[in-house]
Amino acid sequence: MKYNLDKRTFIKLLGITFFSFFLMPFKFAKAVTKKVVNENLTKKQKEIMFNEGTERPFTSDLLNEKREGFYHCANCGAKLFASTAKFDSGTGWPSFTEALPGAFKTKIDYSFGMKRIEYHCANCGVHHGHVFADGPSETG
Protein backbone atom coordinates (compact mmCIF):
# COMPACT_ATOMS: atom_id res chain seq x y z
CA MET A 1 0.00 0.00 0.00
CA LYS A 2 1.42 3.39 -0.98
CA TYR A 3 0.78 6.52 1.06
CA ASN A 4 0.99 9.96 -0.46
CA LEU A 5 2.48 12.03 2.36
CA ASP A 6 4.03 15.43 1.95
CA LYS A 7 7.39 16.02 3.64
CA ARG A 8 5.94 18.09 6.52
CA THR A 9 3.33 15.44 7.43
CA PHE A 10 5.95 12.69 7.25
CA ILE A 11 8.28 14.58 9.61
CA LYS A 12 5.43 15.21 12.08
CA LEU A 13 4.47 11.53 12.10
CA LEU A 14 8.09 10.51 12.50
CA GLY A 15 8.51 12.91 15.43
CA ILE A 16 5.32 11.75 17.14
CA THR A 17 6.32 8.11 16.77
CA PHE A 18 9.88 8.73 18.00
CA PHE A 19 8.93 10.75 21.07
CA SER A 20 5.93 8.56 21.96
CA PHE A 21 8.22 5.54 22.09
CA PHE A 22 10.52 7.19 24.63
CA LEU A 23 7.75 8.73 26.70
CA MET A 24 5.52 5.66 26.81
CA PRO A 25 7.19 3.96 29.83
CA PHE A 26 7.02 7.20 31.80
CA LYS A 27 3.36 7.75 30.98
CA PHE A 28 2.56 4.18 32.03
CA ALA A 29 4.43 4.59 35.29
CA LYS A 30 2.40 7.68 36.14
CA ALA A 31 -0.85 5.89 35.22
CA VAL A 32 -0.54 3.41 38.11
CA THR A 33 -3.21 4.39 40.62
CA LYS A 34 -1.65 5.10 43.99
CA LYS A 35 -3.90 5.93 46.89
CA VAL A 36 -4.39 5.78 50.66
CA VAL A 37 -1.31 7.64 51.77
CA ASN A 38 -0.53 6.43 55.28
CA GLU A 39 0.39 9.59 57.17
CA ASN A 40 2.89 7.60 59.26
CA LEU A 41 5.13 6.59 56.33
CA THR A 42 8.75 7.69 56.58
CA LYS A 43 10.37 9.83 53.90
CA LYS A 44 12.27 6.73 52.70
CA GLN A 45 9.07 4.66 52.46
CA LYS A 46 7.31 7.41 50.47
CA GLU A 47 10.25 7.65 48.05
CA ILE A 48 10.17 3.88 47.43
CA MET A 49 6.41 3.50 47.22
CA PHE A 50 5.38 6.63 45.34
CA ASN A 51 8.48 7.38 43.25
CA GLU A 52 9.63 3.79 42.51
CA GLY A 53 12.77 4.36 44.58
CA THR A 54 15.07 1.63 45.84
CA GLU A 55 16.41 1.37 49.37
CA ARG A 56 20.10 0.72 49.79
CA PRO A 57 20.93 -2.97 50.28
CA PHE A 58 21.35 -4.22 53.85
CA THR A 59 19.43 -1.23 55.31
CA SER A 60 15.90 -2.65 55.61
CA ASP A 61 14.51 -3.31 59.07
CA LEU A 62 12.80 -6.37 57.54
CA LEU A 63 16.00 -8.00 56.28
CA ASN A 64 16.61 -9.98 59.49
CA GLU A 65 12.96 -10.25 60.56
CA LYS A 66 12.26 -13.84 61.70
CA ARG A 67 8.79 -13.72 63.28
CA GLU A 68 6.03 -15.93 61.85
CA GLY A 69 3.06 -14.31 60.20
CA PHE A 70 2.54 -12.01 57.24
CA TYR A 71 4.24 -9.04 55.65
CA HIS A 72 1.81 -6.21 54.91
CA CYS A 73 1.84 -3.16 52.64
CA ALA A 74 3.06 -0.26 54.80
CA ASN A 75 0.70 2.06 52.96
CA CYS A 76 -2.67 0.28 53.03
CA GLY A 77 -2.11 -2.78 55.26
CA ALA A 78 -2.91 -5.41 52.61
CA LYS A 79 -1.27 -8.82 53.18
CA LEU A 80 1.53 -9.38 50.66
CA PHE A 81 3.75 -12.29 51.74
CA ALA A 82 3.70 -15.15 54.25
CA SER A 83 6.80 -15.30 56.45
CA THR A 84 7.29 -18.92 55.32
CA ALA A 85 8.07 -17.62 51.80
CA LYS A 86 11.01 -15.49 52.99
CA PHE A 87 14.57 -16.54 52.15
CA ASP A 88 18.07 -15.04 52.23
CA SER A 89 18.98 -14.15 48.66
CA GLY A 90 22.30 -12.62 49.69
CA THR A 91 21.33 -9.40 47.89
CA GLY A 92 20.73 -7.32 51.00
CA TRP A 93 17.00 -6.95 50.37
CA PRO A 94 14.16 -8.96 51.95
CA SER A 95 13.34 -11.70 49.43
CA PHE A 96 10.40 -14.06 49.04
CA THR A 97 9.80 -17.15 46.91
CA GLU A 98 6.19 -16.17 46.23
CA ALA A 99 3.57 -13.56 47.04
CA LEU A 100 0.10 -14.23 48.35
CA PRO A 101 -2.42 -14.79 45.54
CA GLY A 102 -3.67 -11.51 44.08
CA ALA A 103 -1.37 -9.37 46.27
CA PHE A 104 0.44 -7.64 43.41
CA LYS A 105 0.09 -6.24 39.93
CA THR A 106 3.22 -6.15 37.80
CA LYS A 107 4.59 -4.01 34.99
CA ILE A 108 7.76 -3.97 32.93
CA ASP A 109 10.36 -1.43 34.06
CA TYR A 110 12.87 -0.33 31.40
CA SER A 111 14.81 2.14 33.57
CA PHE A 112 18.61 2.13 33.69
CA GLY A 113 18.80 0.31 30.35
CA MET A 114 17.43 -2.92 31.84
CA LYS A 115 14.20 -4.85 31.50
CA ARG A 116 12.87 -5.77 34.95
CA ILE A 117 9.51 -6.78 36.40
CA GLU A 118 8.29 -4.25 38.92
CA TYR A 119 5.54 -5.15 41.38
CA HIS A 120 2.91 -2.90 42.94
CA CYS A 121 0.37 -3.52 45.70
CA ALA A 122 -2.85 -4.68 44.02
CA ASN A 123 -4.90 -2.80 46.61
CA CYS A 124 -3.34 0.69 46.65
CA GLY A 125 -0.92 0.63 43.69
CA VAL A 126 2.30 1.57 45.49
CA HIS A 127 5.68 0.23 44.37
CA HIS A 128 7.26 -2.54 46.44
CA GLY A 129 10.20 -3.74 44.37
CA HIS A 130 11.28 -5.98 41.51
CA VAL A 131 10.98 -9.69 40.77
CA PHE A 132 14.24 -11.55 40.18
CA ALA A 133 15.03 -15.19 39.41
CA ASP A 134 17.33 -15.58 42.42
CA GLY A 135 15.24 -17.87 44.58
CA PRO A 136 16.19 -21.24 45.98
CA SER A 137 16.48 -23.87 43.23
CA GLU A 138 13.77 -26.05 44.79
CA THR A 139 11.20 -23.25 44.25
CA GLY A 140 11.88 -22.95 40.53
Residues covered by each model-derived region:
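C-terminal segment of N-terminal export signals and the immediately downstream linker at the start
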Residues: M24-N51, E55-R56
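Short Cys/His-rich local motifs and their 1-3 flanking residues in nucleic-acid-associated proteins
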Residues: A78, N123-V126
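Short metal-coordination and nucleic-acid-contact micro-motifs, chiefly zinc-binding Cys/His arrays
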Residues: G69, M114-I117, G140
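Mid-length scaffold segments of soluble, non-membrane domains
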Residues: K66-S95
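Short cysteine-rich clusters marking metal-coordination/redox-active sites
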Residues: C73, C121-C124
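N-terminal secretory signal peptides and thylakoid transit peptides that target proteins
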Residues: M1-F18
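Short Fe-S-cluster ligation motifs
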Residues: G102-Y119
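Short linker/helix segments within small regulatory modules
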Residues: Y110, D134-T139
